[in-house]
From Swiss-Prot:
<comment type="function">
    <text>An aminoacyl-tRNA editing enzyme that deacylates mischarged D-aminoacyl-tRNAs. Also deacylates mischarged glycyl-tRNA(Ala), protecting cells against glycine mischarging by AlaRS. Acts via tRNA-based rather than protein-based catalysis; rejects L-amino acids rather than detecting D-amino acids in the active site. By recycling D-aminoacyl-tRNA to D-amino acids and free tRNA molecules, this enzyme counteracts the toxicity associated with the formation of D-aminoacyl-tRNA entities in vivo and helps enforce protein L-homochirality.</text>
</comment>
<dbReference type="GO" id="GO:0000049">
    <property type="term" value="F:tRNA binding"/>
</dbReference>
<comment type="similarity">
    <text>Belongs to the DTD family.</text>
</comment>
<dbReference type="GO" id="GO:0005737">
    <property type="term" value="C:cytoplasm"/>
</dbReference>
<protein>
    <recommendedName>
        <fullName>D-aminoacyl-tRNA deacylase</fullName>
        <ecNumber>3.1.1.96</ecNumber>
    </recommendedName>
</protein>
<dbReference type="GO" id="GO:0106026">
    <property type="term" value="F:Gly-tRNA(Ala) deacylase activity"/>
</dbReference>
<dbReference type="Pfam" id="PF02580">
    <property type="entry name" value="Tyr_Deacylase"/>
</dbReference>
<dbReference type="GO" id="GO:0051500">
    <property type="term" value="F:D-tyrosyl-tRNA(Tyr) deacylase activity"/>
</dbReference>
<dbReference type="GO" id="GO:0043908">
    <property type="term" value="F:Ser(Gly)-tRNA(Ala) hydrolase activity"/>
</dbReference>
<keyword id="KW-0963">Cytoplasm</keyword>
<dbReference type="InterPro" id="IPR003732">
    <property type="entry name" value="Daa-tRNA_deacyls_DTD"/>
</dbReference>
<keyword id="KW-0820">tRNA-binding</keyword>
<dbReference type="InterPro" id="IPR023509">
    <property type="entry name" value="DTD-like_sf"/>
</dbReference>
<feature type="short sequence motif" description="Gly-cisPro motif, important for rejection of L-amino acids">
    <location>
        <begin position="137"/>
        <end position="138"/>
    </location>
</feature>
<dbReference type="GO" id="GO:0019478">
    <property type="term" value="P:D-amino acid catabolic process"/>
</dbReference>
<keyword id="KW-0378">Hydrolase</keyword>
<keyword id="KW-0694">RNA-binding</keyword>
Length: 148
């Protein structure tokens, strides 16, 4: 499972001109699911991201987590994180999980974050979405459960 975590001051996701998810500040998480991923990976990432200390404390050191700053997560499914660009100019996405598994683990990831007390807004799995955000820092962190 792969995740791109961007610290943001605000973010929203729209589908066909309608805003379906919005956060004030926190993380925008782009989540990709691989074919061998299980709920263990989604739980692991949710726990890591919920405890990720990249918000500034009073002396300016990255030392605070989402809960410490009242942060939220905007979670977006992103199968393109599994793009293979080694051959040709058009990426292959055969390394991504099938949609049923991807959706199930995306929902499990969001449910785990909520169970950990993190407010979560979402896009639509498989939807054609427009995501806008104001990066803070910018701070962008990459996670790949294959590397844990």
């Amino acid at each position: 499972m792969r995740a791109v975590v961007q610290r943001s001051l605000e973010a929203k996701v729209t589908i066909e001109g309608n805003t379906v998810g919005t956060i004030d500040h926190g993380f925008v998480v782009l989540l990709g699911v691989g074919p061998t991923d299980t709920e263990a990976e989604s739980d692991y990432l949710a726990e890591k991201i919920s405890k990720l200390r990249v918000f500034s404390d009073p002396v300016g050191k990255m030392n605070l987590a989402l809960a410490d700053v009242g942060g939220q997560v905007l979670s977006i499914s992103q199968f393109t994180l599994y793009a293979d660009t080694h051959r040709g100019n058009r990426p292959s996405f055969t390394g991504a999980a099938d949609p049923a598994l991807g959706d199930r683990l995306y929902q499990a990831f969001n449910a785990k974050l909520k169970a950990l007390g993190v407010p979560v807004a979402t896009g639509e799995f498989g939807g054609d979405m427009q995501v806008s955000l104001t990066n803070d820092g910018p701070v962008t962190i990459l996670f790949d459960t294959e590397a844990k």
